[in-house]
UniProtKB/Swiss-Prot annotation:
Annotated compartments: Plastid, Cyanelle
Gene encoding the protein: rbcR
GO cellular component, one term: cyanelle
SUPFAM superfamilies: Periplasmic binding protein-like II, Winged helix' DNA-binding domain
Entry keyword annotation includes Endoplasmic reticulum: no
Full protein name: Probable RuBisCO transcriptional regulator
Organism from which the protein derives: Cyanophora paradoxa
A molecular-function term among this protein's GO annotations: transcription cis-regulatory region binding
Amino acid sequence: MKVEELPFSLEQLRILKAIATEGSFKKAAESLYMTQPAISLQIQTLEKKLNIALFDRSGRRALMTEAGHLLLRYGDCILALCEETCHALEDLRNLQGGTLVIGASQTTGTYLMPRLIGLFRQRYPQVTVKLHVHSTRRISWNIANGQVDLAVIGGEVPHELQESLTITPYAEDELVLILPKSHPFAKLESIQKEDLYRLKFIALDAQSAIRKVIDKVLAQNGIDSNLFRVEMELNSIESIKNAVQSGLGAAFVSVSAIAKELELGILHWCRIENITIKRMLSIITNPNRYHSQAARIFSEEILTMFSLQSPEVKKRALSIIQNT
């Protein structure tokens, strides 16, 4: 039997339940703010469609038949599920439940998102948050395919997806040069750009989003990174930091990735004179997909915390997440 062909309605199930609860048609009508004739008509219509008697009317009182009790039992389950569904939807609207799936590129997913998610969960503890960390390219395709609700990335969205996704910048992320504490340059606050050719480098894979940003900015300032002495290429920021700490070379990393190391004094970072390497951090969403209330609020909180129009707000936000 198809749903559209069901011989009963939710309203009729509510009436049947009210009759069983109140003990009579009259009291059921009063509890439902209906007239008794209206109640009787609904039950008669229901019996006709079911082709079975729900009440025995041979005595002074109408008594529920076996069929009536059977329908009542299943009707109670149906009404309970309907009520549960309404509560679940209401919970989602009020951020009292549901799941938020967030995508993030490697650096933002490792160092920034756990803190932001922690702050979000303090306010909305009933929302389950799932974080998927991959390359910017893969996360962008996850958004396009509807596998994640929103993503926070530090690289460029693949060209073939830029027209189909909504890209919202929210902050700038500075990429800095880190050195072992034992390196002679560790005593300096800044170095000349020519000094870069004297360093041994630990680098990310050439296809990584950060590597592309670094190479592009350096090239714009007359520095050919292809001439650097790259001792090794690694695929994670953590392994790069460990290699630098071990004295194997220098590296460019996001400043957000070294807060702990700077606090402990186990790494040094210095500027390159007259050169600042920055990249834009962005929230990406798919305008053709449904955006949950949780996803919208999470995005809004990021935009508020990292307001590009207010350096003071941004500074305060960075302080909050680094000390969380």
